Swiss-Prot record:
Any one GO cellular component localisation term in the record: nucleus
Regions that span the bilayer: none
Subcellular location: Cytoplasm
Protein name: Protein QUA-QUINE STARCH
Length: 59
């Protein structure tokens, strides 16, 4: 089990939010939308948003 700081460092290295990341999320959303039910998209969107939000909240 990693300590909180080790976890943060791992997250920082593996995921740096920036404009291209946001753009990728939008592209993924656009690709997924036609292929899934609305509830599936909403669930996925909430999961991504809450995960990204948590990363910022931890700093």
């Amino acid at each position: 089990m990693k300590t909180n700081r080790e976890q943060e460092i791992y997250v920082e290295r593996s995921f740096k939010p920036n404009n291209s990341t946001i753009q990728n999320l939008m592209d993924i959303e656009r690709f997924i939308l036609p292929h899934t039910s609305t509830s599936g998209v909403a669930r996925l969107k909430m999961r991504v948003i809450s995960w990204v939000g948590l990363q910022f909240y931890n700093y």
